[in-house]
Each structure stands twice: as C-alpha cells, then as structure tokens.
C-alpha cells in the first residue's frame, strides 16, 4: 500500500450509515461562527452519490419556503457531526435530477416498505 492510500484510509469515517439516492437524511453540520460552534440540521432527499473513498460526495435537496436548496457534502468530512437516515426511499434511478423540475406532491418519493421475515 503506498503512502497516499494509507493516508486516505486514515481519513475514512466508519460512523456514517448506509444510504442511497431517494433516502431522506438529516445531516448535522458543524457551523463555526466566530469563537462559537453549533450544529445545524439540513434535512432533505439524497439526489446523488458520486466518487469513492475519501473523495466521495453526496447531494441533498430540500425545498425551503418554496425555494429548492441543494447542498453537496463530502461523506468523510470532519464538518459533518452525524448523519441520520429519516426514511428510505423507493426509486429506480441513481441520479434524481428530475426532482428539480417537479413541484408539490409530484416531487414526493415513495417510502420503501421493509419486508418482515416470514415466520
């Protein structure tokens, strides 16, 4: 293993839950204002995940006061305090860019049902 791979392996985070495009996430972001630090929650739908390793990013979209807002986060960033999966979405695409043109209930993503094991 060369030096860069070893450095990348040290920077990877293991506390990030598994999530896919279509899932609704609560991303707790560390915000530093002057000398104070606080956590800010950004909740929205994952519209894409791209890259791999340390360079992996994901984009979350939400509608705030009628305006669509998208934020792209590095998965392994130290500025992310934690990531929670609010709901699992049932989608058939890896990139959900089509949500940008949809309004209201049309932009709603079906929730994935968890199948109970047969007993």
Curated annotation (Swiss-Prot):
Disulfide bonds: none annotated. One of its GO terms (molecular function) is structural constituent of ribosome. GO terms for cellular component: cytosolic large ribosomal subunit. SUPFAM superfamilies: Translation proteins SH3-like domain. The keyword Ribosomal protein applies. Keywords: Ribonucleoprotein, Ribosomal protein. GO terms for biological process: translation. It holds the Pfam family Ribosomal_L19. InterPro entries: Ribosomal_bL19 (IPR001857), Ribosomal_bL19_CS (IPR018257), Ribosomal_bL19_sf (IPR038657), Translation_prot_SH3-like_sf (IPR008991). Belongs to the bacterial ribosomal protein bL19 family. This protein is located at the 30S-50S ribosomal subunit interface and may play a role in the structure and function of the aminoacyl-tRNA binding site. PANTHER family: LARGE RIBOSOMAL SUBUNIT PROTEIN BL19M, RIBOSOMAL PROTEIN L19. This is Large ribosomal subunit protein bL19. The gene is rplS.
